[in-house]
A protein has these predicted regions:
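Hydrophobic/aromatic residues within transmembrane alpha-helices
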Residues: 30, 39, 43, 83, ...
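Helix-helix packing/entry segments at the starts of transmembrane helices
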Residues: 40-42, 93-99, 167-188, 223-263
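Transmembrane alpha-helical segments that form core, pore/gating elements
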Residues: 48-51, 104-105, 110, 142-203, ...
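Specific transmembrane alpha-helical segments of multi-pass solute transporters/efflux pumps
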Residues: 18-19, 23-27, 52-97, 105-107, ...
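Juxtamembrane helix-entry segments on the extracytoplasmic side of multipass membrane proteins
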Residues: 5-10, 32-37, 41, 58-63, ...
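Juxtamembrane helix-loop-helix junctions in multi-pass membrane proteins
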Residues: 18-46, 88, 92, 163-188, ...
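Hydrophobic transmembrane alpha-helices of multi-pass small-molecule transport proteins
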Residues: 45, 51, 68, 107, ...
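Specific alpha-helical transmembrane segments that line the substrate/conduction pathway
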Residues: 38-48, 81-121, 157, 243-262
Length: 297
């Protein structure tokens, strides 16, 4: 792995984070035609098929794949989609779910007993101030594009994402794309059952039979573009460059998410939202810097 990135690799990394950021808008389009948990089930159906036929199952226990699939499918995406139907805008969802970074750090410290470094504590304080601002406006401002319920649900999704990170870390060096495809199998049936019980069989059947071509494009894109291409290319880049060179690019995901939501969905950008975004991104950036400083020692 080399820290030098050719322009083509840099552009590829930018394309991946652009896809991940703008995908929050695509999710919103899909949710206009599918109930939330059904849409999540379709995402994981297209993430698993036909890739499990092409990609060999990673050499990890089945129960590890099942844990990752349930946490990622029901916990992360099921909850994010549920909140995004009515309770949080795509731009804010892309920002709030990044709390997974800090949940992962805290979990790692609990598991390993490692103490937080001063820069990490500062990063956590900055991000907490940003998320506190979002929580305050979600509770007090009816025009804030987020309810307190929506904020809480996406925070829970971020926690589930962090739990998935811990499972994947335990899996060790595996093909990330194969791991994602095979673990997706375990998300499909639970999400479909939740959809049938909470959204009703009638709405499920109606959505499947009446969705437009664009609705299906949004569903397929979740699996093919966002998951298979996104994770596949990200894994390819991580195999060729150090993580400290590649992972900072992910900071642009909420930036693209917020900008795409503003341009394509006319999501308002009041001052408090810009300040909250800067605080969270400041915290995330400081955390990346802390990781780099630690890596150089």
């Amino acid at each position: 792995a080399t820290s030098f990135m050719p322009l083509s690799h840099l552009l590829l990394a930018l394309l991946v984070v652009f896809i991940w950021g703008t995908n929050f808008v695509v999710i919103k389009w899909g949710l206009a035609e599918f109930p939330a948990f059904l849409f999540a089930a379709l995402r994981f159906l297209f993430s698993a098929l036909p890739w499990i036929v092409i990609l060999r199952r990673p050499a990890v226990p089945w129960n590890m794949l099942a844990r990752a699939g349930l946490l990622l499918g029901v916990g992360q995406f099921g909850l994010v989609y549920w909140a995004m139907r009515e309770d949080i805008s795509p731009g804010l969802a892309s920002l709030v779910v990044q709390a997974q970074v800090f949940f992962t750090i805290i979990m790692s410290m609990v598991v390993t007993g490692e103490r937080a470094r001063p820069l990490q504590i500062m990063a956590l304080i900055l991000a907490t101030c940003g998320y506190g601002l979002v929580a305050w406006y979600s509770a007090t401002d009816p025009t804030s594009a987020v309810t307190l319920f929506g904020f809480g649900v996406v925070m829970a999704a971020a926690f589930c994402w962090a739990c998935t990170n811990m499972v994947m870390r335990k899996a060790g060096r595996v093909n990330m794309l194969a791991f994602t495809a095979w673990s997706s199998l375990f998300a499909i049936v639970p999400l479909l059952l939740i959809s049938l019980f909470t959204e009703g069989a009638d709405s499920v059947v109606y959505a499947l039979t009446h969705a437009s071509g664009w609705g299906w494009v949004a569903a397929v894109w979740q699996g093919v573009g966002n998951t298979v291409f996104g994770f596949g290319m990200w894994g390819w880049l991580l195999a060729r460059h150090p993580a400290v060179t590649i992972t900072p690019m992910a900071l642009l995901v909420p930036v693209f998410g917020i900008l795409a939501s503003a341009v394509l969905l006319q999501e308002a950008l009041p001052a408090w939202k810009i300040i909250a975004t800067c605080l969270v991104l400041g915290g995330l950036s400081l955390n990346v810097y802390a990781s780099r400083a630690r890596g150089k020692r």
